[in-house]
Design a protein with these regions (language model features):
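Glycine-rich, mobile lid/loop segments that gate access to catalytic sites or pores
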Residues: 1-80, 84
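Glycine-rich anion/phosphate-binding loop at the beta-strand->alpha-helix junction
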Residues: 58-61, 65-174
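Internal helix-turn-beta structural module
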Residues: 159-221
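Flexible, glycine/charged-enriched surface loops at secondary-structure junctions
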Residues: 30-37, 54-65, 97-109, 210-219
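Alpha-helical support elements that line or immediately flank enzyme active sites
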Residues: 10-35, 82, 86, 90, ...
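A short glycine/serine-rich beta->alpha loop
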Residues: 1-11, 74-78, 133-139, 182-193
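Generic hydrophobic-segment detector
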Residues: 4, 8, 48, 53, ...
Length: 221
């Protein structure tokens, strides 16, 4: 078979179509969703050369994607099961090959003290603002009006031309598995618009389901 079956990246086409509509609706309300490829195989430069080398070896590479949501008003989300982080994560993990997500400073927060990691409030020019954004624009599952930012990990596809070890269930013996077909050497390159789409859909769904936002949501220019 060609491609990855029900985990094929082709199936994200529908996600991107729906997400494209959500992105436009959010933009009309001053909210912008933008994702970028941050690194491939841990490197932020010479990416083309890395991918070319992987292709020549018949191997694949993982990568990281960073996403930012700007203009999101304060109060989007819920404190428990429908928190903003929860809903974004649920949508993002629908994208094949994503294995991890972190918001704000993410795992680096585990290395800090509370006095270093907390985002403090202060009044400036008559407005209440945060002095930092270590938590990625979300506190207690609810948006803080700061930019929401998160990063995702894309694993390298196991569908490569290098043979792998497997088993024959019917024969009860070890076999060598050879994969053929068309497979991307680095899925992360194609996953950028998918991450944007998933994030936009999650945010839009939360806002339309909240009477505090849905009543003043602009649907048309």
């Amino acid at each position: 078979y060609r491609g990855g079956g029900h985990f094929s990246g082709r199936l994200t086409a529908a996600l991107c179509i729906a997400g494209g509509i959500a992105i436009q609706m959010l933009e009309r309300n001053g909210i912008k969703v933008k994702a970028v490829l941050e690194s491939v195989c841990g490197q932020e430069s010479a990416i083309d050369e890395l991918i070319a080398e992987a292709i020549s070896e018949g191997d694949s590479l993982g990568g990281t994607i960073a996403c930012t949501i700007e203009g999101l008003p304060c109060g989007v989300g819920e404190p428990m099961f429908d928190g903003l982080e929860n809903r974004i994560s649920q949508a993002v993990f629908a994208i094949p090959a994503i294995k991890a997500i972190e918001f704000g400073d993410g795992f680096k927060l585990s290395e800090l003290k509370g006095s270093e990691a907390r985002d403090e409030y202060m009044v400036s020019d008559g407005k209440i603002n945060l002095t930092s954004n270590h938590n990625g624009g979300i506190l207690g599952g609810i948006s803080t009006r700061e930019a929401v930012n998160f990063r995702v990990c894309i694993k390298p596809t196991p569908s490569i031309s290098i043979p792998s070890k497997s088993v024959s269930y019917s024969r009860g013996e070890n076999v060598e598995l050879k994969v053929s077909g068309r497979h991307d050497p680095c899925i992360a390159l194609r996953a950028v618009p998918c991450v944007e789409a998933a994030a936009a859909l999650a945010v839009l769904d939360l806002m339309l389901g909240d009477i505090n936002f849905s009543g003043r949501f602009v649907f048309n220019d």
